[in-house]
Regions:
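PLP-dependent class I/II
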Residues: 1-16, 26-29, 34, 38-56, ...
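A short acidic, glycine-rich active-site loop
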Residues: 60-64, 299
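Conserved N-terminal alpha-helix of the aminotransferase class I/II PLP-enzyme fold
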Residues: 64-99
Length: 396
């Protein structure tokens, strides 16, 4: 019998395991560890959202929904998106409800890419981007952004990466793992490139409610989506969801907004793979969109306080750290210690029981940094920072 490992598809064999999950598994069952690793809110989903899911179950709403998702949810999404992103979509044909934003990402690449076609995206980046492109038989083309330039994606670098095989530009702002926010003037230049070269833009804006404006980061910042710029609505696929801002990670719910012909193509794949997102999750999402804004702002302000704490503590340790404009991550620079990001993270875990994620998990551009998530209780962050300070002091 041929060994089972030889039966695995070649393009799957080459996929690496998620660097985030590798470290998550190292801390499972260890009560002494303070995890700054997994990018998940420490807040429980607000009660009124959970109650909507419970009420849905009590009413016996346990069936399939339309492949596109409940029309009532798509109508609420359309209102929410128009208010937040300043761009309108037809809930009947231009919105697809998915099982998390990760599914939406998978669908858009499988719907749009032919084998060998290229997707340009910026690193450091979310760990799923490269594998999602590879699984759709596309070719990842990376642009390395740098802390010295505030992790800005420069349109000039995008233009230099465009070839006759380029089909998609993938954006993620605010960015995981850096918290960077793209300046509007660069978005405008990238939009002009998309029009000039007739490219589709896929924009993952899952963290857009979590912005930190003002000198102290406590004020809500202003988000601008590339989909709202002139000429971009009909060549953009806007991805968003409920996991981060609404603290609904376990509900596994996201959505894609795009012109009807693109939504239809994505839906055809979705109907054969997932069929639909869970009914009770969709009912909870309706409640989140209708009445969740105060809770989102309460959580955002709490993250802002933790952000400020972590920035202050890293500065006190002498660890250079970019000041994030959004999301809930810090990406301190650890290069001066002469360790790889994985070595640094493993030693910090072994010696001080603090879990962070090696920057290398987010692409080559992430090497030399580690990701620390501040979606963790303020008191735990204080303890983790004390431990980390002792660790870097020993490193000298």
């Amino acid at each position: 019998m041929k060994p089972l490992q030889d039966r695995i598809a070649h393009h799957v064999r080459s996929l690496p395991r998620s660097g985030i999950r590798d470290f998550f598994e190292l801390v499972v069952g260890r009560d002494d560890v303070i995890s700054l690793g997994v990018g998940e809110p420490d807040f429980c989903s607000p009660w009124h959202i959970r109650e909507a899911a419970i009420f849905s179950l009590e009413k016996g709403q346990t069936s399939y929904t339309s492949n596109l998702g409940l029309l009532s949810l798509r109508q609420e999404i359309a209102k929410y998106v128009e208010g937040l992103f300043k761009v309108g979509y037809d809930p009947a044909s231009e919105i697809l409800v998915t099982v998390g934003v990760s599914e939406a990402l998978d669908l858009v690449f499988r719907a749009l890419l032919n084998p060998g076609e290229e997707v340009i995206y910026h690193e450091p980046c979310y760990v799923s981007y490269n594998p999602s492109i590879v699984l759709a038989y596309g070719k990842p083309v990376t642009i390395q952004t740098k802390v010295e330039d505030n992790f800005v994606l420069r349109a000039a670098d995008v233009e230099a990466a465009i070839t006759d095989k380029t089909r998609i530009i993938l954006l993620n702002f605010p960015t995981n793992p850096t918290g960077a926010v793209e300046p509007v003037e660069e978005l405008e230049k990238i939009a002009a490139l998309a029009v000039k070269h007739d490219l589709i833009v896929v924009t993952d804006e899952i963290y857009c409610e979590l912005l930190y404006g003002g000198s102290d980061g406590m004020s809500p910042g202003e988000h601008v989506s590339i989909a709202s710029l002139p000429g971009m609505r009909d060549r953009t696929v806007l991805l968003h969801g409920f996991s981060k801002a609404f603290a609904m990670t376990g509900f596994r719910l996201g959505y894609a907004c795009a012109p009807a012909v693109l939504t239809e193509a994505m839906m055809k794949i979705h109907q054969y793979s997932m069929l639909c997102a869970p009914m009770m999750s969709q009912q909870a999402a309706i409640e989140a969109l209708k009445n969740g804004a105060p809770e989102v702002e309460r959580m955002r302000r709490s993250y802002a306080q933790r952000r400020n704490l972590m920035l202050k503590r890293f500065a006190g340790m002498g660890l250079p750290c970019f000041s994030p404009g959004g999301a809930f991550y810090m990406f301190p620079d650890i290069r001066k210690y002469g360790l790889t990001s994985k070595e640094f993270a493993l030693r910090l875990l072994e010696e001080e029981s603090v879990a962070v994620v090696p920057g290398s998990a987010f692409g080559e551009a992430g090497e030399g940094s580690v990701r620390a998530c501040y979606a963790t209780a303020y008191e735990k962050i204080e303890i983790a920072m004390d431990r980390m300070a002792a660790f870097v002091k020993r490193l000298g």
